[in-house]
Amino acid sequence: MSEKIDFSHVRFLIVDNNRLMGKLVKDILAMLGAVQISLARDYDSALGSLRSGHIDVCITEWNLKPRSGLELLDFIRNDATSADRLLPVIMLTANSEMEYVVESRDAGVTEFLAKPFTADGLYRRLVSVIARPRDFVSVRGYFGPDRRRQQLPFDGADRRAKE
């Protein structure tokens, strides 16, 4: 854990159906110095916190029941009643196959963390979303953090349509 961040003023929302997993994430956040931690057990109970605008980071499980973490992410990024469309969202899941990573990325997730995870793994995702936030992109069919992690030189014709 190289970079030091003061988490005492960061407001977290953890959304997970599994009480033990929610408590584990909460305990890790507390160990890192977080004190403002809210827990929600499902999509519907998370909406109140998300609509209030008093959340700085959302950590959600992909496999929420009856509505998924992706549906929650869609609410955050695209619903008119979402208080913060730029809210950093860390997606937790045991589904670490590339298709899940790509689907999360394409839905606008800020970071992805596969289970089982370590405290250091969560810490690194938190540093990424808090200390090194990415620019957001709004194009037809996508609103979310810039999916490019690095700028690579391009050697070719510019084929993008002029806006």
Predicted segments, located by residue:
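Two-component/phosphorelay signaling modules centered on CheY-like receiver
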Residues: 19-43
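Alpha4 helix (beta4-alpha4-beta5 surface) of REC/receiver domains from two-component response regulators
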Residues: 26, 71, 96-111, 137, ...
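Acidic, metal-coordinating helix/loop segments flanking the phosphotransfer/catalytic sites
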Residues: 39-57
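Active-site residues of response regulator receiver
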Residues: 61-63, 93
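Short amphipathic alpha-helix used as the core "switch/output" element in two-component signaling
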Residues: 63, 68-84
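A short, hydrophobic beta-strand element within the central beta-sheet of small alpha/beta folds
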Residues: 73, 83-96
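C-terminal output helix
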Residues: 117-130, 134, 138
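CheY-like receiver
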Residues: 131-163
